[in-house]
Amino acid sequence: MNLISIFEIVAFIAGLIAYKTIKPTFLKPIVFLLAITVLNEYLVIPYLVSFKKGFNNYGYNVFSFIDMATWFYLFYKINTKPSIRYFIITGAIVSLSYSFIELTFLKDWRQLHTDSFRVYELIIIFLSTYYFYQVMLKQYHNIFGDSIFWLCAGCFLLHLILFINLTMLNNGQYWNLKSSSFVQHILQNIAIFCYYCCITIAFVSCYYSKYLETKQKSRQVLYK
């Protein structure tokens, strides 16, 4: 088990522990997404690899649709502005449709849909940045207690780095570099590491906020 796998499992366990305290409650599907991630990584992918070489991408491609749909739903719930919600719905239809077309007609399911996935990444980067902008407009904002902020931070870092990585991979000249595979591997690990760290912090902030709330109520009862 590598370091990235450990952070992945830690994020999932943190989600299970903090599940009842997660606020806003519409963020709870992230815990189920992490459960599917763990099952995919440790059961589905190993089975597909043992079945036939190259079949592991089937698992990653199917999972990517679940992942994209989940995050589109979450960002839709996060944003209440009609124009942003319209953008999210349009972006979801375009990126999911493009992904299916790329996998079914332009490539095949044994290859990763890198082109369409980059479209999805640009949308997520924009939505995360828009949330940061909304936070900056406030006079005061408790970042640690804002689970949405940390989730957006994780999405922003993950997809920004992966977008750069996938763009470089599509450049034929990039592979002429001796260290290309090493750089690709390092960038991917950094992106995933940042993603799971931020998700874990989001769960910790939910749990800690609930702890402080309970503690404050106990004091109020004590001093009555």
Residue ranges of predicted features:
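Terminal, non-globular segments
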Residues: M1-K224
